[in-house]
A protein has these predicted regions:
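Hydrophobic alpha-helical segments, chiefly the membrane-spanning helices
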Residues: 1-366
Length: 366
């Protein structure tokens, strides 16, 4: 490392931990309040606490990702997102009428927010700035090959069954299939086909990579410890804020699916912003690795974990989407296959994905 690089090394200060700690104190003292202004204030503070720690999780995971390189970097970020999601879902599973459909709604929202909103917005911005962007076609195809059957099996196939849902045995089998599929994917991503997930013309210089920021002066162990601390902070605030959140959503008469949309938006916002920065730096391969890696890891790992939690706690899970949601999700996945079929994208690809994202929003708020 050059002297110039040494000079810009930064020491991370974990002052953002103040927000989740403050939120926990307020939730402990006034979390049972039913007064609407108090409930709104508590939820806003909890939101700030969750987002501050979620951004810190991604920040520390990003440093570790930068040191390990691709594809391990994207893998760390994807797994961090899954841990955040499982903690949010498990915290909310025991409360509210939305509990049986919460995992389904969250998975559907994550698929659509990523494949419609984030991918569309990224390709639109990147296309406006660079006209045409390039990526490793074969790497994107690996994500889609694994993602398409999992999404269909978990969210579409149950509607064709006699009870329009999985039995307990079928749900456990689907959980096993999901985990096994991810295991196979990890094998090709980290062992046999690593080169598929790197575009050779990216990362020529780390100095100009805004996705990673300045080099850190801390050790990898230091970043790993703080990553875990912030994950615990997110889990703690989420669990204590579950009841105030349900109270707020009930008072707003929010649609049942809105809770899943909210959970998905919370966990994707930090990583989504980082990926958008990568696209604007013409590193679209890294951004797509993050986007599709998060979706694939979310389905593959959330389904087994939440299914086991539901099985052990006696909670019911509803898997099948409604007809409008099925149409929009399948259309978005097919569009991904079309958009990335040549390894080149432009603003038209982005506009098409955003059109389907608008259709997704209609299914939530219709």
């Amino acid at each position: 490392m050059s002297n110039a690089q040494e000079a810009v090394k930064t020491r991370h200060k974990e002052t953002t931990l103040i927000f989740p700690v403050l939120a926990l104190v307020v939730l402990f003292l006034w979390g049972s309040s039913q007064t609407l202004p108090v409930v709104i204030a508590i939820n806003l503070l909890a939101l700030i606490g969750i987002l501050s720690s979620a951004f810190s999780v991604v920040r520390h995971a990003d440093v570790l990702a930068h040191r390990l390189g691709e594809p391990y970097g994207s893998l760390i970020l994807s797994l961090s997102v899954v841990i955040l999601e499982v903690s949010l879902i498990s915290a909310l599973m025991a409360t509210g009428d939305a509990a049986p459909t919460l995992m389904r709604d969250t998975l559907y929202s994550i698929i659509m927010i990523v494949t419609g909103g984030l991918v569309g917005f990224s390709l639109l911005l990147g296309g406006r700035k660079f006209a045409t962007q390039y990526m490793n076609l074969f790497g994107i195809k690996q994500y889609l090959i694994a993602l398409f059957p999992l999404a269909i099996i978990v969210l579409v196939f149950p509607m064709a069954l006699p009870a329009a849902n999985f039995s307990t045995g079928q749900a456990l089998l689907v959980a096993l299939i999901s985990a096994a599929m991810y295991g196979v994917f990890l094998l090709i991503q980290t062992k046999t086909h690593q080169s598929l997930f790197v575009y050779e013309h990216e990362d020529d210089s780390d100095d100009d990579d805004p996705h990673h920021g300045k080099p850190s002066a801390h050790s990898s162990v230091w970043h790993a410890i703080w990553l875990i601390i912030h994950l615990i902070a997110v889990i703690a605030v989420t669990k204590m804020n579950a009841s105030p959140l349900e109270t707020l959503l009930d008072s707003m008469n929010a649609p049942v699916a809105f809770t899943g949309f909210l959970v998905a938006l919370l966990i994707l916002s930090p990583e989504g912003l980082g990926a958008l920065k990568a696209v604007l730096n013409n590193q679209v391969q890294r951004a797509m690795n993050l986007f599709f890696g998060s979706v694939l890891a979310t389905i593959s790992l959330t389904v087994p974990v939440v299914t086991l939690i539901a099985f052990m706690t006696g909670n019911e899970l509803q898997f099948a989407l409604g007809a409008p949601e099925m149409v929009v999700m399948v259309a978005s996945l097919v569009l991904c296959h079309i958009s990335f079929s040549t390894g080149r994208t432009n603003v038209l690809n982005g506009a098409a994905h955003l059109a389907l994202f608008a259709a997704y929003l209609m299914t939530i708020f219709a």
